[in-house]
Structures are given as structure tokens and as C-alpha cells.
């Protein structure tokens, strides 16, 4: 029995011998996609368009990119609210999968159309889809309320005025005049310059912002699959640059990377639909058979929702 278990583990998780690692610079240059024609991209809602593609070089890579017009009348952002019994830097939010977050916001009569994961968080005990209390790692604001203090990492911030920016935030940062804020690990793109990185490949979530602050780009890269091996953070920066961003942040990734929306065309009451193929259970599905195992969703410490409110 032990031999069978070991063989199955090898079959499901071993990377093919043909996979070759290259330098981050070489990978970024080879993986550059053609420019996206956003005028013909799929419109999910007014001001929200979706582009999906599958690259074959330098490795199989499947990407989802949502472009959000922050100047679209009535467009609002929200995030996971802080706990009623909130304790700063200890117990700040309750984990939810991105789809459960979308569902719960709609139950609150807030018609979220698009949702995605954001901040890193700890702890995240197994099973990874359980809704437990957790602490966010970085500055976070939800509907004007401070959720987590800054820790010297870059943040995406949208003010109550509608203006947006990306900046490094520390413990002195307050929630004054801020609608929402989420934080990531590091800049992958800064002032139009792609930031260097290692060559580790993972599922990724990245946020990009155009120089004028109008366009928010949400880039999700699937990984740990035979059909999509993941990306480096330098690749994220290169792609965001080509997609029109001036700054970009590498957010929480791995099994947390999720993009979903409310598809009004689906039958039944639950119209939440995944747009990527997350690996929330932490498994590596690196053979064709394993890749057919489907998807698993992780409960994240912070999710972002896009909805519309009458101006």
C-alpha cells in the first residue's frame, strides 16, 4: 500500500523532465503577448472588460486579465470587512473564498459583479477552504474603515473621491479619505520599469494601475498545472506594462489566486462563476491526468469586489 501511495504522489505532483527553467529576463522577453484590443474584449459589465489567453512559450501559461474603468459612473470597490470583534494585527477578518465573498455581498444587497483575492494573510490552517479568523499582512481599508495597519509593503488605494494610486504604506498610514486599500508583497512594475525577480514559478495575482489612475488591471495567472505552469514576478511586471499599467503590485498568489464574476446568463440562483482555475488545496497537478482533477478554492483573508451604485 505504501508503494502505491508514493507512486500516486509522484504521478500527481512531479514536474515533467522537459520543463526547463530560464533566467527571469529571458522568460519575460519570450512571454511578451500581443497587445490586447480592449474594444473587442468581452464586456462583463459597464467599464469592466475581460481578456483571457493561453501562451505556449516559454512554457504553458494561462492568463485572465480584467480591466476596470475607475472613472465609470457609479463603479465602486469594496473588500472583506473587518471582524466585529476586531483585534489589530491579530484577528482582523474572516476568510472566505472569492466566490463566497461575492455571494455574501450580494446577499447584503450589494450587487458585486467581479471579485478577486488580494492581501496575504496568516494563519491559514487546513483544510484551506474553511472560514477562519485571520490577520492580514499589510495595509487594508474596507469601506473607509481601517482593517490592517501598514507594514512597509506597496498598496493599491482608492480614495473616496474616486482617485486611485499605488504607494508603499507603513504603520503611520491612516484610513482618512480612503474608500478601499489592499496590499501585496512588492512592486513588480514601478514608474514604468519592470522590477527584477527570481525564477520561481507560481500561480499569481497582480494589480496594475495606469499612469493617469483611470485603469485598474487585475491579472491572474494559473499555475501548478500541466496546462499552466505559473509565472515569475518579472513576467507579471512585463505583462502589466504591455497592458497599459505604469505601476504594478505582486499580490498574494499561489492557491489564493482567484478571479470570479456574477454571470447573469447562468441558470439557477447561484450565478457565481470562476474565470480561472485555482489550486486552493495546494496540490500540484503537473500531469495531463492530474490536471483534469478540476479546481479547488481557498478561503482568502481579503477579497476585492466591484459593484455599481447609482451616482
Regions found by a protein language model. Name each.
Residues 1-6:
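Sec-dependent signal peptide recognition
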Residues 7-149:
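Zymogen propeptides
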Residues 49-67, 179, 183-213:
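Conserved beta-alpha junction segments in alpha/beta enzyme cores
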Residues 69-71, 157-163, 169-171, 209-214, ...:
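Short acidic-glycine loop/turn motifs at beta-strand connectors
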Residues 80-88, 171-174, 220-225:
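Short, solvent-exposed aromatic-acidic interface loops
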Residues 116-200:
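Active-site-adjacent helix-turn-beta-strand microarchitecture at beta-sheet edges
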Residues 125-150, 193-211, 215-246, 256-311:
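Conserved, well-ordered active-site substructure
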